[in-house]
Amino acid sequence: TDATEDELALTAWARILLEGTPIAMDGSWQLHRRRAAPEPVRFAKRFGGEQSNTSIMVGDAIIIKMFRRLEPGDNLDITVHNALNDAGISSVATLYGFMSGQIPAEEHIPVDLAMIIERLPQPRDGWELITAKAVDLVDVTDLVAGLGQCLRTIHEALRHTFSTVEIDGSRVADDMVRRLDAAVVTAPALARYRATLTARFEKLRGRHLAAQRIHGDFHLGQTLLTPGGWRIIDFLSLIHI
């Protein structure tokens, strides 16, 4: 039986993580608390939906996300949530803590095992929401404007939190023209815009451009609308742009 199917054991474990003083006797893992839990642990159970990780629902306000695929080093989702929380950004979930350990077979390389994060209240999937309104021909201008402002605030915080880099404008121009040509092959209707777009890309040549980290996989499926506004999730990758 998978240990995460035992709700009594899960509840006891969650209480140790969030309320007690957990100690790994063999030193194989550590708990890092970042912020106080919003409520006492009443119950814990495994989320039954299809997910890339194992999610444990702790009461109504917390999720423990256990990573199925372990990667050496810091988990980016943990790092970004912690940084944005510290910056006072309210459009991401609150990180309450995380668990880390070591991989003995890999010369004790550190690895993050799980994150303890806010369970967002009454979330509505952004993709399902916007597409449903599109089918009904409902104006979504205010909704998407709010989402855009939310993303802008996050990216501004990422610019201040993480270092910026300088990139070669000529290389960017080459890459954009190459992508445009590939897009024209796939969608010939774009051909009439090629000259105008290429002219814009050419203006980048010879310039040094400041680039910052942004959400590396942003789409409506990474957004949730809650009573408190838009929330953006899953910072599993960041790219410079």
Identify the residue ranges that each predicted region occupies.
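Catalytic activation segment of kinase domains across protein kinase-like and atypical kinase folds
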Residues: 163, 212, 220-239
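Conserved catalytic-loop position in the HRD/HxD motif
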Residues: 217
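Functionally constrained cores in energy, signaling, and assembly domains
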Residues: 81, 119, 131, 137, ...
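Conserved ATP-binding subdomain of kinase catalytic cores across diverse folds
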Residues: 1-176, 228-229, 238
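An alpha-helical support segment within catalytic cores of ATP-dependent transferases
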Residues: 35-43, 179-214
